[in-house]
Every structure is written in structure tokens, then in C-alpha cells.
């Protein structure tokens, strides 16, 4: 699911939803769900400060469902309220909804920062947003480019190529 909670940058959600579906298929996650929330620089800066203790906005944040309580889960994702808080960070089996879908977590993206990166990298905003979605999904799966000695970067490069994002 793609949610747009910002108004600064015009974004077509449907192509991003189709891309997200394609990423999930490519990674064998067709029975998994996640939420991508497009938000303002101010909102993502608040989350960045609260959860990473870093000042200022960032391009993408990921909140894996199994590892931590997501600030987005109670408001927007299929897991709401007490059920989300109760199941977060217990190290148990992934919560399966009645449909058999595993909820992976939430990704927050700043389209304003994505637009700046798109200009810098000389590519369309839509491509930059897709790159950030892919990056966020890999974080939801447990990859961490800051600690995994290049494993996430290698996988991301390979997937970018397969998904036409090079």
C-alpha cells in the first residue's frame, strides 16, 4: 500500500504500487504486505530524530514489523492499535493476518528529498522513488548497508538491474 501524506511534490501512486508489487514478486514476498508512506521533510525529520537520534530529514526510513514498534503501524497499516503494539518486538513468528499475509513493516519516504536526489543523479523522480522503495524493502528484510560489509549493496545493485533501475 502506498500512502501520500505530503503535498509538496506531486506523485503518481498507482505506478509505485505496481512497482512495489513487482519488487515483492521478485523477492518471493507475494504473501507479504507492507506500507510505503510518502511524507513531508518535517515529518520524516521528526521520525529520524525520534528513532535514529539524527537531526534533519532523510530520504527513507524503514520500520520492520518484527524488530520494533513502527510509528506508522497504528495509524495506517493493516495492523492497528493494540494488536500492533502487542505483537511488536516479541521475537515470535511473524503475525499472520486471517488472509495468511505476513506484515513486513513500514517505509517512510520524503519525495522532496527524492526529487533533489533525482536532479543530482540526473534521473526521473519516479525512478528515484522506486530506488528508495527497493532500498526500504531490503531494510525491512533485515539488510543493513552500515553493518553487512556490502551484502545489501550487492543485492540492491543486482535487483536494480533486474528491475530496470540502473
Per-segment meaning from a language model:
Residues 1-130, 138-166:
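An acidic/histidine-cluster motif and surrounding catalytic segment
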Amino acid at each position: 500500500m502506498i500512502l501520500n501524506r505530503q503535498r509538496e511534490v506531486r506523485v503518481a501512486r498507482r505506478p509505485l504500487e505496481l512497482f512495489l508489487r513487482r519488487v515483492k514478486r521478485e523477492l518471493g514476498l507475494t504473501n507479504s504486505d507492507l506500507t510505503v508512506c510518502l511524507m513531508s521533510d518535517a515529518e520524516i525529520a521528526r521520525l529520524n530524530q525520534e528513532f535514529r537520534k539524527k537531526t534533519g530529514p532523510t530520504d527513507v526510513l524503514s520500520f520492520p514489523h518484527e524488530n520494533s514498534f513502527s510509528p506508522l503501524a497504528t495509524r495506517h497499516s493493516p495492523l492497528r492499535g493494540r494488536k500492533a503494539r502487542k505483537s511488536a518486538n516479541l521475537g515470535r513468528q511473524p503475525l499472520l493476518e486471517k488472509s495468511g499475509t505476513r506484515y513486513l513493516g513500514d517505509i517512510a519516504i520524503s519525495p522532496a528529498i527524492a526529487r533533489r536526489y533525482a536532479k543530482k543523479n540526473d534521473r526521473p523522480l519516479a525512478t528515484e522513488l522506486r530506488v528508495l522503495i527497493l532500498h526500504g524493502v531490503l531494510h525491512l528484510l533485515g539488510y543493513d548497508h552500515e553493518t553487512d560489509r556490502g551484502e545489501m549493496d550487492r543485492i540492491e545493485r543486482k535487483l536494480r538491474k533486474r528491475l530496470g533501475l540502473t
